[in-house]
Swiss-Prot record:
The gene is ligA. Its EC number is 6.5.1.2. Zn(2+) binds at residues 418, 421, 436, 442. Keywords: DNA damage, DNA repair, DNA replication, Ligase, Magnesium, Manganese, Metal-binding, NAD, Zinc. This is DNA ligase. GO terms for biological process: DNA repair; DNA replication.
């Protein structure tokens, strides 16, 4: 039965009431009804919408609970870049004066000109986000990403009750609100207590808990975490209609507040640097009592017309600066130095500290990065050391307090073998990191080795992802890549959330992977510094795996693009007998390959096209990206022109990206490049 006019009217009334209660509770911190009454209204609306689906609208409060997981995070290009703000390195009042001097010089203001008006705000320790409203409706939320391209996280952001799904009044037809998603300290403590009770992951700090929730594919995770939001600016704005466009940063925050969007009350309009210094000192004194984490304050030229005159330098506005506080320090004992083996085989010294309260948390461990850092800082086990929470997040040891030594201290000695698997530990001449050489054998590296081996660009075992690898390794079913080829249907099907069909599909993918190319197999081994392009050159040069395994460093360096560093990596990998044993197990399991190099694609989406690479790609080196394009028939050029077909842009892309935008050249990120190359010929 369809909904009656009374049903439509009641649903609209319930939505208005719930939205008003949400705003009072989550934004104003002034609840207007008891929880039981709110729950009753919510259940009534939910029941109405379930009974009559035609009543459901995108901005209904019932949509905040989170729906089915999305298949993936889609890239979003920011119409107005979300650029970072320069950090003033001088944490004293001198940093404020330096900023004011730069602004006055850029505006060509003489010594007798009136002081510049600024707005002082807090610098939140959270996740930057952009909220896009069209005709008053929230249509998209995106992360900052690299400033130019972020990720669509609308599904998660909808669950944050502080963020309105619909703006009241008559806002511009299009408005992007920029701000920060964060988690209050008390909410973070409750979350971690709940996680600990249920055996879940305990988070290091509120920022990690907030950012991790927003970027989940399943919005229900964000809905279960107590996330908050503060707005601090605009992005793209369309026709204003009857809305009064703000002329200053302060007016903008007031306008956002009038739209029901949360803004922080701790802000000040200051004339000249003196008011900013007073604001900096006042917030520093109140910092520990704030209900959320901050790592500094932000100063902005208040007038928008002056902001436009000042403009930008590279990726930063001239009209704003972040002024961080000095990291907090304490002294404690360096009880011991232990070695952790990471997923990539890095042996990392970790300081075990006598518990000390610093920067708002109790610190018991600190990373020492590598042996050279320990020597550079002159640390001895048993030292009294200065511990700092750098950036208020990562604990680090600054230095020993030498005058407190009593003679019982002892030096740290880096182990010569991996403490996990016993393989030889080695350090390249130009590297500071010591690494385990048992890449295919070491338990600490198992999961990473299996994921790399099964990757699409390696042995291409479809269906073998992170969660399944966790189950296989944690359950003791798989230890090395060779064990994959011993899996049976019954053992796989008995795993949690693994149906017979999924198990059969995985076994089929494993079976298919038995036949590869030599280049793919070499890449799949996960030899450090050996990417796809180098693997192809090695396969082309040696023609067989045995010849490669027996090659010495001198012969390895005869291969194109293989220098001393790569040659030592390859030789060290094959010198470890554990790795050779796994390779022989793979051969015995029927893994084989064509001793040749794949032909360059003669026809396809990249064939005959000219590409230009700029910036740092997330997972590929520039050489790997170049080789991948060329293997599909494309050509890579060093400069952008009208003849350029595509520009592949990563983080920190520079003038080439700007030139491409000017010429209207198609721009791809790494995922876009892969999708293009995967298109059928």
């Amino acid at each position: 039965m369809s909904a009656s006019p009374e049903d439509f009217e009641r649903a609209a009334q319930l939505r208005r009431e719930l939205e008003a209660h949400d705003h009072a509770y989550y934004v104003l911190d002034a609840p207007t009804v008891p929880d039981a009454e709110y729950d009753r209204l919510f259940r009534e609306l939910d029941a109405l919408e379930r009974r009559h689906p035609e009543l459901l609208v995108p901005d209904s409060p019932t949509r905040r609970v989170g729906g089915a997981p999305v298949p993936g995070l889609v890239p979003v290009r920011h119409a107005v870049p979300m650029l970072s703000i320069r950090t003033e390195t001088d944490t004293t009042s001198g940093g404020v004066i330096a900023f004011d001097t730069r602004v006055r010089n850029a505006l060509e203001l003489g010594p007798h000109a009136p002081p510049v008006e600024y707005l002082g705000e807090l610098k939140f320790d959270g996740l930057a986000i952009s909220l896009r409203y069209e005709n008053g409706m929230l249509v998209r939320a995106a992360t900052r990403g690299d400033g130019y391209t972020g990720e669509d996280v609308t599904h998660s952001v909808r669950t944050i009750r502080q963020i309105p799904l619909r703006l009241p009044g008559r806002p511009p037809a299009l408005i992007e609100v920029r701000g920060e998603i964060y988690m209050r300290r008390d909410a973070f403590e409750r979350l971690n207590a709940r996680q600990s009770e249920t055996g879940g992951k305990v988070f290091v700090n509120p920022r990690n808990a907030a950012a991790g929730a927003v970027r989940q594919l399943d919005a229900r995770i964000a809905a279960r975490r107590p996330l908050s939001f503060f707005a601090y600016g605009f992005g793209e704005i369309g026709e204003s209609g009857g809305w009064n466009m703000p002329a200053t940063q302060g007016e903008m925050l007031d306008a956002l507040d009038a739209l029901g969007i949360p803004v922080c009350e701790h802000r000040v309009v200051a004339s000249g640097p003196d008011g900013l210094i007073a604001f900096h000192d006042r917030i520093a004194a109140a910092r520990d009592s704030l209900p959320y984490d901050i790592d500094g304050v932000v100063y902005k030229v208040n007038r928008f017309d002056l902001q436009r005159r000042l403009g930008f330098v590279t990726r930063e506005p001239r009209w704003a600066v972040a002024h961080k506080y000095p990291a907090q320090e304490e002294i404690t004992e360096l009880v011991d130095i232990e070695i952790q083996v990471g997923r990539t085989g890095a042996l990392t010294p970790v300081a075990r500290l006598k518990p000390v309260f610093v920067g708002g948390v109790t610190v018991t461990n600190a990373t020492l990065h590598n042996e050279e850092e320990i020597q550079r800082k002159g640390l001895l086990i048993g030292d009294q050391v200065i511990v700092r929470r750098a950036g208020d997040v990562i604990p680090q040891i600054v230095a020993p307090v030498v005058e407190r030594r009593n003679g019982s201290e002892r030096p740290f000695v880096m182990p010569q073998t991996c403490p996990v698997c016993g393989s030889h530990a080695e350090k390249q001449p130009d590297e500071a990191v010591t690494r385990c050489s048992g890449g295919l054998f070491c338990p600490a590296q198992r999961k990473q080795a299996l994921l790399h081996f099964a990757g699409r660009r390696a042995m291409d075992i479809e269906g073998l992802g992170d969660k399944l690898v966790d189950q296989l390794v944690d359950g003791g079913i798989v230890s090395t890549p060779a064990d994959l080829y011993r899996l049976g249907l019954v053992k796989l099907a008995n795993l949690p959330r693994m149906a017979d069909k999924s198990a059969a599909n995985l076994l089929a993918a494993i079976e298919k992977s038995r036949h590869a190319t030599l280049a793919r197999f070499i890449f799949a081994l996960g030899i450090r510094n050996v990417g796809e392009a180098t693997a192809r050159e090695l396969a082309r040069h040696f023609g067989s795996l045995d010849a490669l395994m027996d090659a010495d460093i001198e012969r390895l360096q005869q291969v194109a693009d293989v220098g001393p560093i790569v040659a030592h990596s390859i030789a060290g990998f094959f010198a470890e007998m554990h790795n050779r044993e796994v390779i022989e197990q793979l051969r015995a399991a029927g893994v084989h390959w064509d001793e040749g190099v794949p032909a360059v694609a003669a026809d396809g989406p990249a064939s005959g096209k000219t590409f230009v690479l700029t910036g740092a790609l997330p997972t590929m080196s520039r050489d790997d990206a170049k080789a991948l394009i060329e293997s599909h028939g494309g050509k890579v050029s060093g400069s952008v022109s009208k003849k350029t077909d595509y520009v592949v842009a990563g983080a920190e892309a520079g003038s080439k990206l700007a030139k491409a935008q000017e010429l209207g050249v198609a721009i791809l990120d790494e995922d876009g490049l892969r999708r293009l190359l995967e298109q059928p010929a």
